[in-house]
Amino acid sequence: MDHATLAMILAIWFISFHFIKLLFSQQTTKLLPPGPKPLPIIGNILEVGKKPHRSFANLAKIHGPLISLRLGSVTTIVVSSADVAKEMFLKKDHPLSNRTIPNSVTAGDHHKLTMSWLPVSPKWRNFRKITAVHLLSPQRLDACQTFRHAKVQQLYEYVQECAQKGQAVDIGKAAFTTSLNLLSKLFFSVELAHHKSHTSQEFKELIWNIMEDIGKPNYADYFPILGCVDPSGIRRRLACSFDKLIAVFQGIICERLAPDSSTTTTTTTDDVLDVLLQLFKQNELTMGEINHLLVDIFDAGTDTTSSTFEWVMTELIRNPEMMEKAQEEIKQVLGKDKQIQESDIINLPYLQAIIKETLRLHPPTVFLLPRKADTDVELYGYIVPKDAQILVNLWAIGRDPNAWQNADIFSPERFIGCEIDVKGRDFGLLPFGAGRRICPGMNLAIRMLTLMLATLLQFFNWKLEGDISPKDLDMDEKFGIALQKTKPLKLIPIPRY
């Protein structure tokens, strides 16, 4: 066969292949959810913008609550309403439970070593069991109430000192330090930061870098063939951040395992690290899995909690009548001097409503971590094709006008007298997800948010630093897995008693 014949055969094959592919694509497109027309090669990448949650919410207003996009070569389905989320999690959770893996989280094989990114599998189920039984079980959380109250007491003392000096409190940083020390005490029996040290800010920046890089739009995700070259450098940056955080964990672990460590002889700290090391010795976990499990827990348990707390205080400073109402409720239940106990939370419905309303408008994660269709799945009358990426836009669902009256207005009263909760059963409010992938740290996060908020409202009034009017407060946000305020909230505490 001469070269000309071979070239002709190859050309015919190439044209035929792409013609058939085009026909198949056109037939399949008719079954896909509606969406904006993609451009050649890049698809709908230009529609993403710097704040994808807002861009996709605007597209949903045009095309409907379930839309399809082609981001480069990746078919992406976006869920933007409570009705679609309900059908997805109640009826289609199983075939839509696996993950699309962002190129960035392949750094250090993170996607192979942690529960968040593993596919549903025996290994994933084992990790889930370890987390539910050994790490964040209700029994362990109940047994560690003393830790939580001690960390909240430290927060109170720090704020009291700032009040005496007339200094403003960086609300997000203070909440981050409290959350970080709670987790480090629970897991390692040590504190990793102090309110007046630079260490807390360094940790906060490191954790935010991880959250931002994982959530950031990435050309290597739109065109997987580019993954090996990491065109935006995101994977390299994330690998560096992982290494820095793991180095902290390894320092603590090596000290615990040292032959002269008191915890290796007759005493025990009875903390989570002891449990993890016991599982390591029993070959149920590798050291790499322990390191990356800790990365996940400290990322999710510090940045998202502190960001949510900052948004709570932001909304209350903009709505002083709601802050006063919450303070009055706390006074009626606790009086002036009694510090809140977790058993008191049930008697503070308005405070709980404030937290729920904040989670509705400012969910801890903007999108649930991306899911992947194992097969063609019918959803809301359309076909989600095999291997498509599914994004659940929590930010849009929380503002779904079909699920919420005056959806853009901060109104805790909407939760008074109703049974809506955040445990994945009410599909207009899914801050921690739903189904088999629901966040295992949900109960700890809610307890800490409530304790911190009740304490800071019980003992202090608050005003903005400078001459800014609350209604002029900057509400701009930085996009990552979580949404942080672009400009940190700094408030001056004023003792109430």
Curated annotation (Swiss-Prot):
Gene3D superfamilies linked to this entry: Cytochrome P450 (1.10.630.10)
Transmembrane annotation, as ranges: 4-24
Gene Ontology CC, one term: membrane
CDD domains in the cross-refs: CYP76-like
Induction: Regulated by MYB1.
Pfam families from the UniProt entry: p450
GO MF entries: heme binding; iron ion binding; monooxygenase activity; oxidoreductase activity, acting on paired donors, with incorporation or reduction of molecular oxygen
Keywords: Heme, Iron, Membrane, Metal-binding, Monooxygenase, Oxidoreductase, Transmembrane, Transmembrane helix
Annotated EC: 1.14.-.-
Positions of heme binding: 439
Cofactor list: heme
Membrane topology: Single-pass membrane protein
Other observations noted: A frameshift mutant replacing 108 native amino acids with 27 new residues followed by a stop codon results in an inactive protein (AC P0DKI2) and a yellow mutant phenotype.
UniProt similarity note: Belongs to the cytochrome P450 family.
PANTHER family: CYTOCHROME P450 76AD1-LIKE, CYTOCHROME P450, FAMILY 76, SUBFAMILY C, POLYPEPTIDE 5-RELATED
Name of the featured protein: Cytochrome P450 76AD1
